[in-house]
């Protein structure tokens, strides 16, 4: 089985990504926040798409479309609250992820750190635009 795992081109990709993945010796629960960020982002995108199917951005009907989502759409209230609370959870995980990077000295890898800071500012700008939308 290990020969197929090491030699087959498609299985080799999965092997290097999941099975023989090098992990640091000091791995702990702090290393979960990157995966939780991906999960939170997927939930935000999914619930955002579902909410966008029923939301009307016209100033005259925006409030009534939100009321329609909460009252008339099946589990619309749940989707709306998952989207709202998911944004807060996303930022909690994001700041804990950055804090873990600072604690473990990840800023020494300059290119990776700079890319993370650019992504942090892009996420914060996107969230600001989401809160400011009429």
Curated annotation (Swiss-Prot):
Q: What's in the keyword line of the UniProt record?
A: Electron transport, Heme, Iron, Membrane, Metal-binding, Mitochondrion, Mitochondrion inner membrane, Respiratory chain, Transmembrane, Transmembrane helix, Transport, Ubiquinone
The residues that hold heme b b566 are 97
Task: Give the binding site residues for heme b b562.
Answer: 83
Report what the protein is called. Answer: Cytochrome b
GO molecular function term, any single one: metal ion binding
Q: Which organism is it from?
A: Microtus subterraneus
Short name of any one Pfam family annotated for the protein: Cytochrome_B
The function of this protein is: Component of the ubiquinol-cytochrome c reductase complex (complex III or cytochrome b-c1 complex) that is part of the mitochondrial respiratory chain. The b-c1 complex mediates electron transfer from ubiquinol to cytochrome c. Contributes to the generation of a proton gradient across the mitochondrial membrane that is then used for ATP synthesis.
- TM regions (residue ranges): 33-53, 77-98, 113-133
Topology within the bilayer: Multi-pass membrane protein
